[in-house]
């Protein structure tokens, strides 16, 4: 008999499996808006539920149906529970249907077609048919709940459903899946109608050559809503072209019966045959033959509108129900030709097949597609070993058509056939006698001999067939005059309402868009063509003599043509405001010296603070280990809590057990929503540090370069609540809750040296990219601490340095993971805290915001110059340090520039910026904005200064600013005015106020959407546009990005999630030159609208 713990573990394992499957089904329902009945998640869910229901089932409850215990159980439950009784009836009907189908498959095929709704179920679906049907019928949760309430009748005592806790949990878990909609309608189409972005762009490329040439950017000034009665004729070619291309792709409603490329068609007599793709499609209603020129299939049509329209005119679409005869001509030296003759006797252009039996294969597919209602006359013959062959008949074709011949000659002899398409079981509408019986009076007006009759429908109905009198003629003129008058009134009415709508829209433009652009229009051609941009020769002249080109002219060149890549390093500091246009070389050198001095000073300040933080954390960790080691109730794993990459904090009044509990509640500081670390990681963390020793004192002193006082110890904690969350124990003190970022303790710092290498780590046993080891020996840990302490002594050993004994605290410590940011850091009021959307932590800031009286009495780390680093500042800096290190490590690692040394530069610049703006702190995405600057400038101090200038504008886009909502509102106004059709689609889908797919674009200035070379071009254009055309140029780039793909969005009726998915797949694959040109055109259009020219 299994032990009690083993049974409990089995129940938990079964329950965990069900939880996982429920989670997957709910995720599928949310992301795809429906759940496929044949989804693999349904199968695995049914298997998991069945395992739980059968666990501990009594043999008596299972009955004698050993092969299907679920069926026996549900049938027994059905005797006293109506939902289960109804389920049993449905499933038994399904089983009979499936069994009957299996039997009929052995017999006649037509009998199978008479079966009502034959279910197409996989073997696994049939295996779990009872659970599956109960789920789709929304009674599974009710039946399981009934089993839980009456478990003693059906289950042994160790069964999952007998457990007073696990049984109700299982029943509750099933409520969610039973509330969902399960359908085959959407899903059957889903695999065809939800193609990737590549597929959508490819389809659009094929048929876009026939779209209207007045694209959204070339429309009239204002886009009045289309009235189909007037503008529909212009739209028909584009719609038919799109539908034509869509029809070429097989979907759930249309089957591709035959496809062959390089089939020749001669559209006109005066031109050569054109190769193309011939395809035969079948739907439930009709069979269609299509032929598309290769130029359209390959997207290789010329740029001229004439060429595009001509090739679309050549495309052929034929409904087979309109075809009566097929004339087949075979030649010995070619593959064969098919001529289709329609019911009215018109012959279609011949299709010439290449060699290789393709004509016979086409006829075979056509004959199979006509079945069961239609057939070829004469039918193709079947020959053993060869399949379908041409019939060998002797002059049996109908009179009036070409004769089909047969002979005893070889098969490759030239032979002609005429096949007729007939439908034996139906009354043909193409019978010649029916046509002959039609009276001349009942013919369409187009076929009437008298042209006058066709102009007036009333006369043609009342007049005689012999011809009309003069009365009829006079009678016809009255409706004609009335028709002309109506047309005149309609034209005037449309013109008036169009003018009225124009005036209203123009008022909206002036109200909402006038502030988005500069009202002075700068020409790209005056005083010279700006298409070449700012070249090296022009820049060299300007540097030698700043009076040769005015600032506005340089900005105009950059706006219309960009900056030559070789001179970007020299030009960008001017664009970003590091230098002012017109500065002399001496003035620029003075600015550089000031920036280098300021950067060195900032570096020394935060490096000094970082050194104190890291050493203090080592002290706290060692003290915590000593206390935890003395506890007799602790298991052996807690003796190895120190991980060399761990993040720790010294929390007062905490026991070792609460430390272990909080250890498992640490939140990752990335922007993901993962809150809990895995148990394996916790055990590994505990196993790697049991041998760390505590050092009672550390040598401490003032940092290099004479550290000045940073901001006060109480900077605003605005926007850090989610990054500084705490746990629920009310006795935590922020005075001692510092985080350990033990990756790179600042090593051997040289006084007066502010170079990048000041921030490098000298820990002999650690590396940022090294994977954690299973264990650290005691000796290795001690050596690591000694090396770190020696590095700190060297850094602090400056004349006048002062040793400061850091306070030691008793109590538990919490061991965490590198990069955590979920610790208390401030003593400010909760009123100043706000949420960050990047979800640094999901734990609320609670009692640890208050500083205890005992903590206030303890000394803070100080330098010899009197600078005091308050515990609050240490906490706040450490929180941001971990965020920075996490983002730096994953910043564009695939790009060639970001080696380990350059990543260190990136970290130094970001830490320096955050030190100067500690009240704002680091937010995910800032590294993305700094990275391109560092790539171009390749100088820490210069990149730091330019990044500071850039963030003056970009800071407002982050959560602590309010610019993002303004961007969304402006995007709404722009799309409403410039592309009303797209706006209507978004309004229809309820997304017109939520342009969240633009969020990443505005946050990072399109950095994630483009490759690096394109990012450089877009950024410098944005910076120049502020002075040339618009300070909100990012809006027009975003609008251009939408407009480039607007036809794809409209054609596929994309909603909010579809648009996000599409642009995520298209990231780094956009044509930046096209987008920038379109953005400039859009700016110019708005400027023209405002001027009302």
Curated annotation (Swiss-Prot):
GO cellular component: cytoplasm; cytoplasmic vesicle membrane; Golgi apparatus
Biased composition (Polar residues): 647-676, 702-736
Disordered: region residues: 377-412, 645-778, 810-838
PROSITE patterns: RUN, TBC_RABGAP
Impact when changing residue 261 to A: Abolishes interaction with RAB9A
Coiled coil location: none
Ranges for region Required for interaction with RAP family members: 301-350
Region (Important for interaction with RAB9A and RAB9B): 256-297
Comp. bias (Basic and acidic residues): 687-696, 766-776, 820-829
PANTHER family found in the cross-reference section: SMALL G PROTEIN SIGNALING MODULATOR 1, TBC1 DOMAIN FAMILY MEMBER GTPASE-ACTIVATING PROTEIN
Protein's name according to its UniProt entry: Small G protein signaling modulator 1
Species this chain originates from: Mus musculus
């Amino acid at each position: 008999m299994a032990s009690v713990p083993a049974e409990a573990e089995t129940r938990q394992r079964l329950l965990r499996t069900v939880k996982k499957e429920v989670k997957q089904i709910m995720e599928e329902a949310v992301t795809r808006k429906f759940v496929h009945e044949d989804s693999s998640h349904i199968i695995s869910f049914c298997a998991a539920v069945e395992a739980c229901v059968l666990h501990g089932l009594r043999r008596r409850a299972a009955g004698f149906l050993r092969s299907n215990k679920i069926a026996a159980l549900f049938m027994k439950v059905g005797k006293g529970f109506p939902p289960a009784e109804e389920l049993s009836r449905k499933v038994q009907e399904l089983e009979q249907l499936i069994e009957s189908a299996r039997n009929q498959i052995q017999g006649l095929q037509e009998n199978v077609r008479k079966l009502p709704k034959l279910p197409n179920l996989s073997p696994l679906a049939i295996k779990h048919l009872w659970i599956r049907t109960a789920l789709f019928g929304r009674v599974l949760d009710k039946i399981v709940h009934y089993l839980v309430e009456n478990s003693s009748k059906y289950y042994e005592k160790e069964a999952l459903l007998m457990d007073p806790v696990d049984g109700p949990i299982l029943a509750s878990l099933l409520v969610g899946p039973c509330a969902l909609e399960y359908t085959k309608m959407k899903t059957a189409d889903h695999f065809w109608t939800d193609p990737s972005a590549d597929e959508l762009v490819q389809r659009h490329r094929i048929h876009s050559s026939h779209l209207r040439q007045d694209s959204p950017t070339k429309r009239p000034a204002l886009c009045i809503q289309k009235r189909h009665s007037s503008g529909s004729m212009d739209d028909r070619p584009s719609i038919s072209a799109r539908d034509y291309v869509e029809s070429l792709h097989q979907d759930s409603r249309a089957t591709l019966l035959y496809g062959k490329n390089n089939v020749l068609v001669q559209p006109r007599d005066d031109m050569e045959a054109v190769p193309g793709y011939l395809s035969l499609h079948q739907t439930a209603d009709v069979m269609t033959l299509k032929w598309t020129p290769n130029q359209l299939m390959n997207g290789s049509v010329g740029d001229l509108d004439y060429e595009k329209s001509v090739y679309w005119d050549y495309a052929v679409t034929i409904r087979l129900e309109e075809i009566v005869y097929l004339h087949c001509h075979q030649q010995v030296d070619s593959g064969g030709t098919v001529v289709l003759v329609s019911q009215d006797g018109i012959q279609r252009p011949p299709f010439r097949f290449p060699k290789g039996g393709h004509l016979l294969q086409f006829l075979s597919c056509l004959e199979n597609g006509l079945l069961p209602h239609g057939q070829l006359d004469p039918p193709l013959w079947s020959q053993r070993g060869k399949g379908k062959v041409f019939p060998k008949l002797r002059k049996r074709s109908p009179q009036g058509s070409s004769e089909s011949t047969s002979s005893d000659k070889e098969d490759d002899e030239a032979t002609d056939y005429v096949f007729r398409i007939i439908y034996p079981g139906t009354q043909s509408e193409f019978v010649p006698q029916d046509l002959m019986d039609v009276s001349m009076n009942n013919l369409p007006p187009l076929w009437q001999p008298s042209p006058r009759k066709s102009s007036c429908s009333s006369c043609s109905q009342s007049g005689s067939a012999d011809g009309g009198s003069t009365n009829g003629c006079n009678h016809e003129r009255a409706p004609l005059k009335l028709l002309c008058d109506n047309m005149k009134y309609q034209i005037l009415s449309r013109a008036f309402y169009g003018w009225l709508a124009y005036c209203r829209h123009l008022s909206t433009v002036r109200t909402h868009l006038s502030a988005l652009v500069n009202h002075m229009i700068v020409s790209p051609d005056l005083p010279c063509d700006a298409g070449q941009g700012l070249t090296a020769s022009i820049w060299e002249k300007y540097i030698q003599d700043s009076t040769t080109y005015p600032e506005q002219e340089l900005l105009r060149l950059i706006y219309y043509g960009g900056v030559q890549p070789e001179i970007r390093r020299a030009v960008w500091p001017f664009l970003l405001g590091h230098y002012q246009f017109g500065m002399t070389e001496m003035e620029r050198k003075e600015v550089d010296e000031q920036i280098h001095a300021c950067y060195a000073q900032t570096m020394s300040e935060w490096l000094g603070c970082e050194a104190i933080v890291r050493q203090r954390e080592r002290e706290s960790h060692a003290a915590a280990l000593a206390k935890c080691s003395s506890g007799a109730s602790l298991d052996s794993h807690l003796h190895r809590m120190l991980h060399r990459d761990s993040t720790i904090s010294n929390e007062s009044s905490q026991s070792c057990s609460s430390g272990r509990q909080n250890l498992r509640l640490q939140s990752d500081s990335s922007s993901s929503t993962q809150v809990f670390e895995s148990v394996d990681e916790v055990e590994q963390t505990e196993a790697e540090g049991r041998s760390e020793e505590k050092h009672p004192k550390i040598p401490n002193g003032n940092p290099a370069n004479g550290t000045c006082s940073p901001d006060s110890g109480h900077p605003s904690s605005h926007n850090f609540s989610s990054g500084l969350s705490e746990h629920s124990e009310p006795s935590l003190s922020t005075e001692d809750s510092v985080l350990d970022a033990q990756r790179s303790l600042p090593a051997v710092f040289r006084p007066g040296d502010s170079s990048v290498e000041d921030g490098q780590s000298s820990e002999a046993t650690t590396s940022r990219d090294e994977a954690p080891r299973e264990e650290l020996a005691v000796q290795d840990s001690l050596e690591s601490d000694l090396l770190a302490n020696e590095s700190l002594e060297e850094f602090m050993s400056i004349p006048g340095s002062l040793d400061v004994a850091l306070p030691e605290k008793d109590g538990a410590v919490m061991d965490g993971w590198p990069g955590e940011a979920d610790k208390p850091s401030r003593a400010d009021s909760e009123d100043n805290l706000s949420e960050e959307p990047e979800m640094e932590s999901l734990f609320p800031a609670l009692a640890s915001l208050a500083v205890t009286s005992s903590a206030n009495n303890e000394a803070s780390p100080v330098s010899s110059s009197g600078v005091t680093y308050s515990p609050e500042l240490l906490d706040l800096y450490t929180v941001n340090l971990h965020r920075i290190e996490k983002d730096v490590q994953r910043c564009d690692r695939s790009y060639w520039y970001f080696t380990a040394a350059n990543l260190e530069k990136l970290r130094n610049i970001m830490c320096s910026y955050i030190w100067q703006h500690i009240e704002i702190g680091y937010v995910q995405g800032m590294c993305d904005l700094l990275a391109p600057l560092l790539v171009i400038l390749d100088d820490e101090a210069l990149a730091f200064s330019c990044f500071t200038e850039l963030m003056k504008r970009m800071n407002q886009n982050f959560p602590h600013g309010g610019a993002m909502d303004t961007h969304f509102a402006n995007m709404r106004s722009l799309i409403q005015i410039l592309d009303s059709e797209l706006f209507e689609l978004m309004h229809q889908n309820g997304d017109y106020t939520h342009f969240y797919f633009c969020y990443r674009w505005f946050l990072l200035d399109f950095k994630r959407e483009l490759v690096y070379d394109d990012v450089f071009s877009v950024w410098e254009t944005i910076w120049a546009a502020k002075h040339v055309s618009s300070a909100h140029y990012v809006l027009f780039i975003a609008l251009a990005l939408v407009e480039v793909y607007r036809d794809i969005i409209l054609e596929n009726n994309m909603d909010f999630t579809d648009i996000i998915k599409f642009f995520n797949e298209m990231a780094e694959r956009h044509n930046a030159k096209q987008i920038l040109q379109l953005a400039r055109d859009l700016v110019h259009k708005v400027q023209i609208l405002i001027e009302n020219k």
